[in-house]
């Protein structure tokens, strides 16, 4: 939320390590679903190549708060094929629940929009 490029890089490296632990654990199992998704996008980070060859990349921000950009969904394991690359966040817990045998969400909680089936 602070539009801090250094923190973006260090946090993403730590996040990558954590996700790899989860993926390694789930690898070869049929009872573990790994879902990686953000609750929102913040800042509208943009990366350019700099002004000349050999210069560092430049970063910029288009906003200081949440943006309307969709968030990506990455998943592996049971029912992961039901999770699209982008979808309404409200559908994700419903799809995860399918792995627990929950199929009746009630009429007000049915899957809707992109990613619905």
Predicted segments, located by residue:
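A post-motif C-terminal structural segment
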Residues: 1-117
């Amino acid at each position: 939320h602070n539009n801090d490029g250094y923190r973006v890089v260090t946090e993403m490296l730590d996040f990558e390590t954590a996700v790899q632990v989860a993926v390694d654990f789930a690898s070869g199992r049929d009872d573990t679903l790994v879902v990686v998704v953000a609750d929102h996008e913040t800042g509208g980070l943009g990366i350019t190549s700099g002004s000349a060859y050999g210069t560092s990349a430049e970063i910029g921000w288009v906003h200081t708060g949440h943006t309307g950009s969709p968030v990506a969904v990455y998943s592996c394991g049971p029912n992961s094929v039901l999770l699209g690359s982008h979808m309404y966040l409200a559908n994700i817990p419903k799809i995860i629940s399918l792995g627990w045998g929950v199929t009746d969400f009630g009429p007000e909680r049915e899957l809707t929009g992109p990613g619905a089936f």
